[in-house]
């Protein structure tokens, strides 16, 4: 009997039959089906420092309009596609989020545009 045939036959067993097979193998060979390696891995993982996930989504927050408010409003309109009134309200209501959940590259590009227009910006 090949191993493949044996595996297929075991696959046909019911859960009760599989449980009985495990018990019989444990008794016959004097082994335990309990996972030994899992306890070792869990203990090793507990000693490690917590893993910090790298942030993948960023928000660009306008913290202040600065001296050249008109240029900042123009930049906000270009970035967001908002109308003049909406862009002005966003700039006047600083601190406000200009763009949410964007890539790091896009966030840095937008922050640079707003800073070049005279605004104070924060990337979160």
Curated annotation (Swiss-Prot):
The keyword RNA-binding does not apply. One of its GO terms (cellular component) is ribosome. One of its GO terms (molecular function) is structural constituent of ribosome. It holds the Pfam family Ribosomal_L12_N. One of its GO terms (biological process) is translation. The keyword Ribonucleoprotein applies. InterPro entries: Ribosomal_bL12, Ribosomal_bL12_C, Ribosomal_bL12_C/ClpS-like, Ribosomal_bL12_oligo, Ribosomal_bL12_oligo_N_sf. It comes from the Bacteria. Signal peptide: none annotated. Keywords: Ribonucleoprotein, Ribosomal protein. Belongs to the bacterial ribosomal protein bL12 family. Forms part of the ribosomal stalk which helps the ribosome interact with GTP-bound translation factors. Is thus essential for accurate translation. Homodimer. Part of the ribosomal stalk of the 50S ribosomal subunit. Forms a multimeric L10(L12)X complex, where L10 forms an elongated spine to which 2 to 4 L12 dimers bind in a sequential fashion. Binds GTP-bound translation factors. This is Large ribosomal subunit protein bL12. It comes from Pelodictyon phaeoclathratiforme (strain DSM 5477 / BU-1). The gene is rplL.
